[in-house]
UniProtKB/Swiss-Prot annotation:
Catalyzed chemical reaction(s): Endonucleolytic cleavage to 5'-phosphomonoester
Cofactor(s) in the UniProt record: Mg(2+)
Domain of life: Bacteria
Source species taxonomy: Bacteria, Pseudomonadati, Pseudomonadota, Gammaproteobacteria, Alteromonadales
Catalytic machinery residues: D46, E118
GO CC aspect terms: cytoplasm
Record organism: Shewanella piezotolerans (strain WP3 / JCM 13877)
PANTHER family for this protein: RIBONUCLEASE 3, RIBONUCLEASE III
Protein name: Ribonuclease 3
Function summary: Digests double-stranded RNA. Involved in the processing of primary rRNA transcript to yield the immediate precursors to the large and small rRNAs (23S and 16S). Processes some mRNAs, and tRNAs when they are encoded in the rRNA operon. Processes pre-crRNA and tracrRNA of type II CRISPR loci if present in the organism.
Pfam families found in the cross-reference section: dsrm (PF00035), Ribonucleas_3_3 (PF14622)
Length: 225
């Protein structure tokens, strides 16, 4: 099996340099490609992600109920959210998949991408320690943690629209500026334009809707600073 290419670029994207690169290789290896795959690392990363996000929400929302905290955590650690992070990292470019998964477009499949993010978290923990892992996860989630609210768990597009309406501002304009890949495996690049920002904000995802949500989340972060 060929080595994974462009590892230095991926490490720069992640914000972490592995001392033991074999851990990263394993985290990127799907069970269809090798017996030494990423499922055990995924198990570990899932637990670490849960405690890091739980701790962040507990301190960020001191008056939130247990139910509110649970719903916010579920939103942040769900497969859809993890897959969005994977797409932002272009993680599909680095995955090791078996021939069948490659042929069926597994490098774009939400579940495979989400599992790989959790596996990378597990690999970083084993390569360093829990505090280093915590800082990285919080950095990856910074924009999402800034815009999440205890009530209703509205999506970023809805939250952005309500925020702009509150201040009597024009609604955002979303525009697809680029698509890439075959019809069933496309990546969408969407621009979001709002009055208060000098330039458009770009979101990239596996669907137009997800790309719009990603762009809206970034806009919310910028205008609430």
């Amino acid at each position: 099996m060929e080595p994974i290419k462009n590892i230095p670029r991926l490490c720069r994207t992640l914000g972490y340099e592995f001392a033991e690169q074999a851990l990263l290789d394993q985290a990127l290896t799907h069970r269809s490609a090798s017996n030494k795959h990423n499922e055990r690392l995924e198990f570990l990363g899932d637990s670490i992600l849960s405690i890091v996000i739980s701790d962040a929400l507990y301190h960020q929302f001191p008056k939130a109920t247990e139910g509110d905290l649970s719903r916010m955590r579920a939103t942040l650690v769900c497969g859809k959210m993890l897959a969005e992070i994977a797409i932002e990292f272009k993680l599909g470019d680095y995955l090791k998949l078996g021939p069948g998964e490659l042929k069926s477009g597994g490098f774009r499949r939400e579940s495979i991408l989400a599992d790989a993010v959790e596996a990378i978290i597990g690999a970083i923990y084993l390569d360093s320690d829990i505090e280093k892992c915590r800082k990285l996860v919080l950095n990856w989630y910074a924009s999402r943690l800034r815009v999440i609210e205890p009530i209703n768990q509205k999506d970023p597009k809805t939250l952005l629209q309500e925020h702009l309406q509150k201040f009597r501002k024009p609604l955002p304009i979303y525009k697809v500026v680029h698509t890439e890949g075959d019809a069933h495996e496309q990546t969408f690049t969407v621009e979001c334009v709002v009055e208060d920002l000098r330039q458009a904000v770009v979101g990239v995802a596996s669907s137009r809707r997800k790309a719009e949500q990603s762009a809206a989340a970034q806009v919310l972060e910028l205008i609430k600073k």
